[in-house]
């Protein structure tokens, strides 16, 4: 039996004595897309930050490629992290931004231009290579954000609400990028509020509430249960008193950039 690329077992986390994650189990295989669904404060972002190696669980384990991403640098480098916020330098061009991330990923000067070109081709942004990121639309910036996460040639890409606030054209472009990544065997974990998006993209979905995964399976099965009113009762009972601070409070741009860049170092 092939070991899954990502295995989370009994993961628990608390902030300021408030439970954020509670005994979470999750697996994700290569070339698979898993959608994390649930309301604000359900624990989606916190779980993704655990998997990205930004946080360590207070109980349980997180493994990516059999290694602990919080403690093992090589494991973190196998992960592409795309936060909700734009983690780019607005005054630098698209190519210059990607060059910074390529350097952080340890790519040598001679290979850097090729790595940047490959990431731009995969995300279909080569036409904007010489334009400052700050002059691009929000949807285009999100594609540059995804391209930046690919500099480490990750086996796993984590995306937190990648299509939030973008128009239908930009949404379709981002969906196309994710489809190409899956074809290359990349594992993808995407947090979203949009059931239609999850149904279109994901092989499986996990519905979170109150720091727990309360439903997991195919979207068809989950939607059938929703129509029958089954999960609502459980979700209502397990919703937290308020959203987790790290999931709703906007963070300074420099803080987000530093967090993303840390994963590539």
Residue ranges, per PLM feature:
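The feature captures the beta-strand-to-loop junction immediately N-terminal to the Walker
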Residues: 37-39
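Helix-to-loop junction immediately C-terminal to a conserved catalytic motif
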Residues: 52
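Conserved ABC transporter NBD signature motif
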Residues: 60-70, 75
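Conserved ABC ATPase "signature" region
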Residues: 99, 103, 110-128
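Catalytic Walker B motif of ABC-type/P-loop ATPase nucleotide-binding domains
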Residues: 157-160
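ABC ATPase "signature
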Residues: 216-217
């Amino acid at each position: 039996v092939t070991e899954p690329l990502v295995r989370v077992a009994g993961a628990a986390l608390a902030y300021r004595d408030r439970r954020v994650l509670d005994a979470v189990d999750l697996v994700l295989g290569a070339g698979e897309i898993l959608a994390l669904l649930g309301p604000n404060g359900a624990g989606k972002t916190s779980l993704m930050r655990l998997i990205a190696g930004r946080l360590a669980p207070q109980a349980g384990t997180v493994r990516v490629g059999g290694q602990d991403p919080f403690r093992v640098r090589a494991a973190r480098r196998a992960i592409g992290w795309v936060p909700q916020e734009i983690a780019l330098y607005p005054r630098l061009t698209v190519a210059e931004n990607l060059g910074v991330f390529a350097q952080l990923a340890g790519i040598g000067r001679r290979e850097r231009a090729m790595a940047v070109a490959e990431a731009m081709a995969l995300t279909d942004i080569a036409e904007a290579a010489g334009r400052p990121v700050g002059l691009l639309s929000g949807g285009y910036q999100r594609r540059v954000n995804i391209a930046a996460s690919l500099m480490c040639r990750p086996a796993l890409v984590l995306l937190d609400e990648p299509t939030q606030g973008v128009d239908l054209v930009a949404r379709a472009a981002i969906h196309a990028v994710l489809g190409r990544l899956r074809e290359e065997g990349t594992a993808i974990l995407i947090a979203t509020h949009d059931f239609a998006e999850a149904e279109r993209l994901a092989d499986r979905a996990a519905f979170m509430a109150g720091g727990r995964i309360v439903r997991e399976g195919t979207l068809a099965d989950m939607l059938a249960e929703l129509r029958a009113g089954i999960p609502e009762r459980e979700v209502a009972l397990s919703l937290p008193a308020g959203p987790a601070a790290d999931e709703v409070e906007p963070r300074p741009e420099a803080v987000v950039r530093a967090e993303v860049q840390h994963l590539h170092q």
